[in-house]
Amino acid sequence: MKVKPLGDRVLVKPDAVETKTAGGIIIPDTAQEKTQRGVVVAVGDDKEKIKVSVGQKVIHDKYAGTQIQIDGVDHLILKSNDLVAVVE
């Protein structure tokens, strides 16, 4: 399925959540924190507000966006102002 965000929205594929600590302790699902990083998969057509492009790694607000599944993979649709940084 192909999803094209509208306006100033951005489609992000979140990074995988860590399931193990550096010391080897397994973190249960209930204790795992939602990741705030991901890769931009698609952008809307509002070029004035959107300052990122497809393929860039970004950090977003913790509770922002709408979670959707595309072909069984979790994604987030975020407003461009919910993005807080680009990871270089």
Curated annotation (Swiss-Prot):
UniProt-listed GO biological process terms: chaperone cofactor-dependent protein refolding
Task: Write out the coiled-coil annotation as residue ranges.
Answer: none
Q: Which UniProt keywords apply?
A: Chaperone, Cytoplasm
Q: Does the record carry Lipid biosynthesis as a key word?
A: no
Q: Does the keyword Repeat apply?
A: no
What family name appears in the similarity comment? Belongs to the GroES chaperonin family.
**Record-given protein name:** Co-chaperonin GroES
